[in-house]
Amino acid sequence: IKNKYTSSTKLAAKGVSAGGIPVGMAVIERPNLFKAALLQVAGLNSLRYENTRNNFTIPEFGTAKDSTEFNYLYAMDIYHNIKDNVQYPSLLITGEVNDELIDIWQPGKAAARFQEVSKGKHNVVLFKVGDSGHSGNSDRIIDELDNYSFLFWQLNDPRFKLK
């Protein structure tokens, strides 16, 4: 954006699984940089990881039981860093009912919070639930078509306008 290669009206971000953490934090810290973002099967409530099926991440991310590690987990926790009265970019947040790594309530909880605080005139927060696991299923191509159709729609690609 600074070098004029693009603008915020043409920029989208996608974060999958743990990649949803940096993308989610970028959206929270610099919402004005993005028109849209996709957070796909992402762990969005890191303070609660150890109380889920994803508790194997304790050696990687830390534990909320240690005060220093708690502070790091809080700093990267999407849900707890969502601010009131902010115009966030349009978001598509996905979760899978049978995800063996990310419990379905994590993306759902974050989507509900984004919907609660979003003040954008054209802001869209969608929560899409599938029934496969963390790595998708045989309908993965359809899922990706849905995901990219959302992003192109939000980026005002004329081929993806609603009719």
Regions from the PLM with identified roles:
Residues 1-163:
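Active-site-proximal cap/loop segments of hydrolase catalytic domains
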